[in-house]
């Protein structure tokens, strides 16, 4: 609906939204996962900025609902927020309260909380914090999770050496059914670094064996996978998609 760095969105064109959704569905696209602007901070202490984030996110949900009504599956992904010194407990509570306000106005599209690397005062730095936020949301059906592979490793979960253990923990704390999308990124700095620096596929600390495991996981492989790696050349993402597809065991 708007630039990831911008604050304003264009007015909704119902006919255009319907045509877009119908075309996606007709051409066999999977779920549409929109990334909300990075400037949203539902956990912030600045009341004006927090009010803006709530209002803008509600507007985004309203806009995307017009596409969902065509039958196209749609989600909006957000970075949960940063508590900026208020403490994670307060930050998680504010995020839940903000989402409840969003859903009072618009509830036609599920909001996905992205797993975070734990940089600075980020909330959502572990599965427990995400679960706390989700448990504070009144309409549980309106909230899910985006699993960012780089962020999860950077947050301290050993996806390389204990893939099954991490997935079990994710299932116990949040529930695998709540995971609706995957951001597929390698990691420059790796386990427990809290750096959030993406690397191209196979060129970081996760490595090809991990991605082989991921794309052959019977549950995770069914989810939409979105690359957020650096485009080194115009062919980078095409080549990475081909690489990932080549890892799928027939």
Question: What is the predicted role of each segment?
Answer:
Residues 14-34, 95-108, 131-137, 205-217:
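Alpha-helix-loop-beta-strand connector modules within alpha/beta enzyme cores
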Residues 32, 75-76, 111, 182, ...:
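Hydrophobic residues within beta-strands of alpha/beta enzymes
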Residues 1-36, 40, 44-59, 250:
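N-terminal pre-domain/capping segments
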Residues 25, 41-144:
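Active-site acidic/histidine proton-transfer and metal-coordination neighborhood
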Residues 8-16, 45-56, 86-97, 121-129, ...:
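Alpha-helix N-cap and loop-to-helix initiation/capping positions
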Residues 131-250:
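Histidine-acidic metal/acid-base catalytic patches
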Residues 1-3, 37-39, 81-83, 114-118, ...:
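Active-site beta-loop-alpha junctions enriched in small/polar residues
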């Amino acid at each position: 609906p708007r630039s990831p760095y911008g604050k304003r969105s264009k007015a909704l064109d119902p006919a255009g939204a319907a045509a877009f959704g119908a075309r996606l569905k007709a051409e066999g696209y999977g779920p549409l996962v929109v990334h909300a602007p990075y400037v949203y901070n539902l956990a912030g202490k600045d009341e004006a900025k927090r009010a803006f984030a709530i209002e803008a996110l509600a507007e985004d949900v309203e806009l995307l609902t017009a596409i969902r009504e065509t039958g196209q599956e749609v989600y909006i992904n957000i970075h949960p927020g940063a508590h900026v010194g208020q403490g994670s407990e307060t930050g998680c509570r504010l995020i839940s309260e903000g989402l409840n306000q969003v859903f009072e106005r618009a509830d036609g599209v599920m909001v996905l909380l992205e797993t975070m690397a734990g940089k600075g005062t980020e909330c959502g730095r572990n599965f427990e914090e995400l679960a706390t936020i989700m448990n504070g949301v009144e309409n549980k059906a309106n909230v899910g999770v985006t699993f960012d592979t780089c962020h999860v490793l950077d947050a301290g979960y050993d996806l390389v050496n204990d893939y099954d253990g991490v997935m079990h923990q994710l299932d116990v704390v949040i529930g695998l059914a709540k995971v609706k999308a995957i951001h597929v990124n390698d990691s420059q700095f790796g386990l427990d670094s809290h750096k959030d620096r993406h690397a191209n596929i196979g060129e970081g600390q996760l490595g090809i064996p991990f991605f082989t495991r991921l794309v052959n996981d019977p549950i995770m492989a069914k989810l939409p996978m979105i690359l957020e790696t650096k485009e080194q050349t115009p062919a980078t993402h095409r080549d990475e998609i081909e690489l990932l597809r080549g890892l799928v065991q027939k």
